[in-house]
Each structure stands twice: as structure tokens, then as C-alpha cells.
Amino acid sequence: MIRRSVVDSCIWAFGIAAALSGCVSIAPVTVAAPPGVRGVPTGMQYLYGSGEVAAISRQAYAALTTYVSGRSRMHWPVGGGPTVRMLPQSVVLASDATLAAPRFVDCVGKRPAIVLDVDETALLNTGYEYADAASGLPYDAARWERWERSDGRASGAVPGAVDALKAIRALGVTVIFNSNRTAVNARYTEAALTRAGLGPVRHGETLFLKGDAPGGSAKDPRRAIIAARYCVIAMVGDQLGDMTDLFNAGLTPAQRRSATAAPEVAGLWGNGWFLLTNPVYGTALAGDYDAVFPTDQRWVDPGTTKE
């Protein structure tokens, strides 16, 4: 998770009025996004309240389980010998890799694991987002700190996650979490995950948090620690940075979008890299009017043009 701001009810209108003011053939209009019900931001309605996202999440976790099951049928080598079959390839990029030239950490002598983000990937922060929506206040680091240290009763598992992780553990695959929650609050995060049915977890073994490695919110240093111990056959998140920090390396929204479709990495989606929906916060919520709408894909409603 990378938390920046909560989507408010006007995010889809950002920059539109300014762009329209320069079009002399278009009458001035006021654009407003649907306000939601009783002021609930539409992104929160979608993520925390809709059946659509619940179905998407279950679909993603079902696909993850099927994928991991197929991988786990291979022989996991702990030494040489004639019974060793083809090594399953790690999906963690090596330290010298790029998106244009990806190279992956090797799996020799390592047992299988999957790595998941926590917030809005495995655990829904419904209670925290309720407080944000009800107060109308912007994101506040101190409030998030208080939430991390809460008892976790107002959070719950992402639909499909509990059954998937239970099935994956039964296959002999270790489940590891890599989160930007802080290491000083590790025991609270352990408790929240366990309460939601996503455990067992143990900080430093199957739970890695901000502060466990250099780099602050960057997850690659923690991924490197995990990949040194395990053959990471799948990763799950709600942000591109849950797969590699290279997606956050100064790329524009258009460049990030293009990077996901590049031949070198496109085949990983649903095949080692699994991404869930998050329209509420994160690196996806970026881009002005020009960045979001390509010039060759714009329509001017003739009903708004002047006679």
C-alpha cells in the first residue's frame, strides 16, 4: 500500500473546467462527479460496498490459488539428484533488472512462498475509511498511526483471501506479507491479520514492514530479503509498486500504463503478478486532464456547442 490521499467526490472533475474554458466552441459548463449516497465518496462505495469489487477480489484470489497449485506440483530442489525437475522461476526482479530488461532472482535451494501487500490487498481498512469519509478530513499520518495501533475490529479480510491463503498454505507454500505499515506497530498488525483469519504471521519471518530494511516506503529492499530466503512464485497487491518499485521510479501516468503492457512484463499479470482494485488511494490516482485523456480519444458533445 502507498497511501497518499482519499478520493473525494470531485476527483473525476479535476481539471475539466480549466480545460473547457479554453475551447471557444463549447459553452461554459459545470462538471461534477456523482456525490454518492449521504456524501460517501464514490471510490469508497465501489471498494468497500460494492458486489462488483467483492467479485473481482474473489476472482483474483481464485486465480492465484489455481496458479500456485500448479506451481507447487513441481519438485522443489534442496540439492542435486535425478529427481529434480525444472525450477519454477521467481517473480521477484533482481536488483539490476529493469522493466525493459527484466531478470529474476534464482530459486536454487529455496522453498516456495507468495508475497502479499496487506492494506486493501489482504485486509480492508473499512473502519479507517469510514472515519475519513465521515470527517471529510484529508489523510493525516497521526490518524493512520492511531489506526495501526487499534484492535483491528473495524477491519476485515478482502473477499476470497481467507480461503485462498488457507489453501495455499495447505500446499506447503509459505505466505508472507510485505506492508508499509510501520515495524514499531508490528504486534498490532500481526493481531489484525490473525483476527481477520489471514494468519498465522510473525514479524521478521512472514511479516515485513516499513523500517525492517533501508528505503522507507520502497518495498524492493524488503522483497530482496524475502527472495533471498524463498522462491517467491507469486506476488499480490493493489499498487504496481507491490510488484516492483521500478513502476514508481519517476514515470508519468502514461509511462506507467504503457509499462504494464510492455512485452517484457505483460505476461506476468495473472501469471505470477496479481493486482486487485483500489480506487480510493495510491499511486494510480495521478494525472491531469491531458495525462488521462489522450488527444486522439476525446469527444466533444455537439449538444454543448454554440450555434
Model-derived regions: residue spans:
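Non-catalytic pre-domain segments flanking phosphatase-related domains
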Residues: C23-L116, D288-E307
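C-terminal cap/substrate-recognition subdomain and adjoining C-terminal extension
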Residues: I26-V31, A62, A186-E307
